[in-house]
Amino acid sequence: MTNIRKTHPLMKIVNESFIDLPTPSNISAWWNFGSLLGMCLIIQIATGLFLAMHYTSDTTTAFSSVAHICRDVNYGWLIRYLHANGASMFFICLFLHVGRGLYYGSYTFIETWNIGILLLFAVMATAFMGYVLPWGQMSFWGATVITNLLSAIPYIGTTLVEWIWGGFSVDKATLTRFFAFHFILPFIVAALAVVHLLFLHETGSNNPIGLNSDADKNPLHPYYTIKTALGFLLMFLVLLSLVLFCPDMLGDPDNYMPANPLNTPPHIKPEWYFLFAYAILRSIPNKLGGVVALVLSILILAIVPFLHNSKQRSMIFRPISQCMYWLLMADLLTLTWIGGQPVEHPFIIIGQIASILYFTIILILMPLSSMLENKILKW
């Protein structure tokens, strides 16, 4: 008799995706981040649901309701800090997942890659709106500054901003709609993640050497489920260390002050995971130019597959491209650092150089490196 997991309509889908899935035998720990992102999403939805039970999306009570969660709700502090630091873990896993895709040439699965970019935008939107909800100083001013950027769009900009605000400034209407969107978006992210997996399973996984692995595959379970379990364990170790020992390390002290429209904080900055994009935005003196650069800093990932001109898929045997890749990583770390610094000399010029370098590496230096390596292969 055939096993029920192979015949039952629902279990068959689970079986083909998570149990009998043919997986390349040589994939490394870098292939763990997809499942870690799934776990992050589950943690965020679960903790977020319990937070939503006690949170009130009203400007007069939002800040107090978050304080009430931390002080009066059973393990409320734990749920709140798991949610806040869970977002940081989410972005760490996201950046490593995208970095892996760039290094090993996974972007040649164009549909999977493009849905991944959509997922990145959706998660960034969710995180931004979530940061507004505690209604602290940085929540309010972050929302004001970032939504105000849309006013740079010619002709419809101002109308668009007021439409998003639901008035003439960030106020009660804005907070209420941001809460509604913040609640619904993770479910849209979950649906997109299913589509992401669907397209991935059409082609099968890439592997470190970037060659066809049809001749050498293993079932996902038990060979990779055990590696996934170890990944979960390590992620929980880092997350719980953050939550239990230094829960506010990645946050901003200004957000412990209630939102005050009459008092601007000395340095308005977003959460650490947006700092690289914020640095690119600030490095351009023109408002519209800054907004375009901000969007392009992420959207540039969509043209990476078309810039790939190497005879090899992965970077594992391409030392010049590897140098360019690690230069890009160093540049992103520099941008992240600059995004958290005040707008003054020498940070302005460092940010501008790092921003130019970011686009130059991706658009010019990486394709040139590939061409050079192709030439070397012929010699």
From Swiss-Prot:
| Superkingdom of source | Eukaryota
Q: What are the BP-aspect GO terms? A: mitochondrial electron transport, ubiquinol to cytochrome c
List the transmembrane segments: 33-53, 77-98, 113-133, 178-198, 226-246, 288-308, 320-340, 347-367
The cofactor(s) it depends on are: heme b
Instruction: State the Gene3D superfamilies in the record.
Output: Cytochrome Bc1 Complex, Chain C
> Can the keyword Membrane be found in this entry's annotation?
yes
Instruction: List positions binding a ubiquinone.
Output: H201
* SUPFAM superfamilies linked to this entry: a domain/subunit of cytochrome bc1 complex (Ubiquinol-cytochrome c reductase), Transmembrane di-heme cytochromes
Keywords (alphabetical) are: Electron transport, Heme, Iron, Membrane, Metal-binding, Mitochondrion, Mitochondrion inner membrane, Respiratory chain, Transmembrane, Transmembrane helix, Transport, Ubiquinone
Localization per record: Mitochondrion inner membrane
Q: Extract one GO cellular component term from the record.
A: mitochondrial inner membrane
Summarize where heme b b562 binds, as residue positions: H83, H182
Membrane topology, record value: Multi-pass membrane protein
Sites where the protein binds heme b b566 = H97, H196
Where is it mainly found?
A: mitochondrion
What does the cofactor field's note say?
Binds 2 heme b groups non-covalently.
Extra facts: Heme 1 (or BL or b562) is low-potential and absorbs at about 562 nm, and heme 2 (or BH or b566) is high-potential and absorbs at about 566 nm.
Assembly, in brief, is: The cytochrome bc1 complex contains 11 subunits: 3 respiratory subunits (MT-CYB, CYC1 and UQCRFS1), 2 core proteins (UQCRC1 and UQCRC2) and 6 low-molecular weight proteins (UQCRH/QCR6, UQCRB/QCR7, UQCRQ/QCR8, UQCR10/QCR9, UQCR11/QCR10 and a cleavage product of UQCRFS1). This cytochrome bc1 complex then forms a dimer.
* Stated family: Belongs to the cytochrome b family.
Free-text function comment from the UniProt entry: Component of the ubiquinol-cytochrome c reductase complex (complex III or cytochrome b-c1 complex) that is part of the mitochondrial respiratory chain. The b-c1 complex mediates electron transfer from ubiquinol to cytochrome c. Contributes to the generation of a proton gradient across the mitochondrial membrane that is then used for ATP synthesis.
Q: What name appears for this protein in its UniProt entry?
A: Cytochrome b
Q: Which organism is it from?
A: Jaculus jaculus (Lesser Egyptian jerboa)
